[in-house]
């Protein structure tokens, strides 16, 4: 096994120059003492410095697909890193899959479970988990992107608010999941963002022209439920449960990949990146069972098949224990 402590300082300084956030510096310093001597501790850092991009809106643009007569403020694109944390307990080793977020208003930084729909916060109440970054391995596991913007919406019912004000509009901050694609350019700063907007639409942002563009509207009633960037293209999965996947080119051209034929409607399906392959995973769960549904749940996994650079369809994979 390589001895990482023997790396020369000039190489370590080169690595540090490519770190984007203060938390990456924490991970860098946790490797060994010689690495810690290259970078001082981040004692004065009050945040994680999660990487963000400021994105502007076109005049009259809205995510709903309808023209608007009021200006939209800019939005913020945020990269949310996910880590696998290994720590020790009296009962043995344990693992925590968590996403990292900025602290707010001087509050301590916190971890969120990316698998939890109710956004359980680790570090508060009964879910409190303490670990030492020098002794607990922290492994980068992945990342996703979200966009935060403000939009005018009808005022919802509020206690004590006169009823004649319920139909007024107010600015509401909204956060949505998006897919990010880094593009080849001389300065390595060009990127594209795909967002599954409302009314079954897709909208794309290009940093080169700094504007959002409406992608061709979905020809049917199903919305898009999953987006993935893969090999310089976007892939979108609709919510039909029938394995319908669409390729979205940067030119805004949309093409449907031959669907998974002969498939019954799945209860849930997702696009998954696995190394250099794109997988379609379908989950089938009986509708009438709840407490023991895991006993009757089964999956089908398909791999995207490519021929001469074009997508020919998804083929069923045979999974083994080897």
From Swiss-Prot:
Domain spans labelled F-box: 2-50
Name of the protein described by the UniProt record: F-box protein At2g16300
Family matches, as InterPro entries: F-box-like_dom_sf, F-box_dom, KIB1-4_b-propeller, SCF_F-box_domain
One Pfam short name: F-box
Entry superkingdom: Eukaryota
Organism the protein comes from: Arabidopsis thaliana
């Amino acid at each position: 096994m390589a001895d990482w402590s023997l790396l020369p300082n000039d190489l370590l300084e080169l690595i540090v120059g490519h770190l984007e956030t203060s938390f990456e510096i924490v991970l860098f310093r946790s490797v060994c003492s010689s690495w810690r001597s290259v970078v001082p501790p981040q004692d004065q850092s009050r945040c994680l410095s999660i990487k963000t991009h400021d994105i502007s809106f076109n005049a009259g643009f809205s995510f709903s697909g309808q023209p608007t007569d009021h200006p939209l403020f800019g939005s913020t694109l945020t990269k949310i890193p996910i880590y696998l944390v290994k720590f020790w307990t009296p009962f043995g080793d344990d693992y925590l899959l968590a996403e990292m977020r900025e602290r707010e208003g001087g509050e301590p930084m916190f971890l969120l479970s990316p698998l939890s729909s109710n956004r359980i916060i680790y570090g508060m109440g009964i879910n409190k988990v303490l670990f030492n970054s020098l002794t607990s391995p922290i492994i980068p596991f992945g990342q996703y992107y979200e966009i935060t913007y403000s939009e005018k919406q009808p005022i919802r019912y509020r206690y004590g608010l006169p009823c004649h004000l319920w139909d007024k509009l107010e600015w509401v901050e909204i956060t949505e999941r998006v897919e990010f694609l880094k593009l080849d350019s001389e300065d390595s700063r060009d990127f594209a963002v795909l967002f599954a907007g409302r009314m079954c639409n897709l909208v794309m942002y290009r940093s080169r022209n700094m504007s959002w563009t409406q992608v061709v509207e979905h020809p049917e009633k199903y919305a898009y439920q999953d987006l993935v960037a893969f090999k310089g293209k976007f892939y979108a999965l609709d919510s039909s449960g029938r394995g319908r996947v669409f390729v979205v080119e940067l030119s805004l051209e949309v093409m449907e990949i031959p669907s998974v034929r002969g498939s019954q409607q799945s209860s849930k399906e997702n696009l998954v990146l696995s190394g250099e392959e794109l997988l379609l995973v379908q989950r089938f769960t009986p509708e009438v069972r709840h407490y023991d549904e895991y006993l009757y749940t089964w999956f089908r996994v398909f791999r995207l098949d490519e021929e001469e650079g074009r997508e020919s369809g998804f083929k069923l994979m045979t999974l083994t224990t080897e």
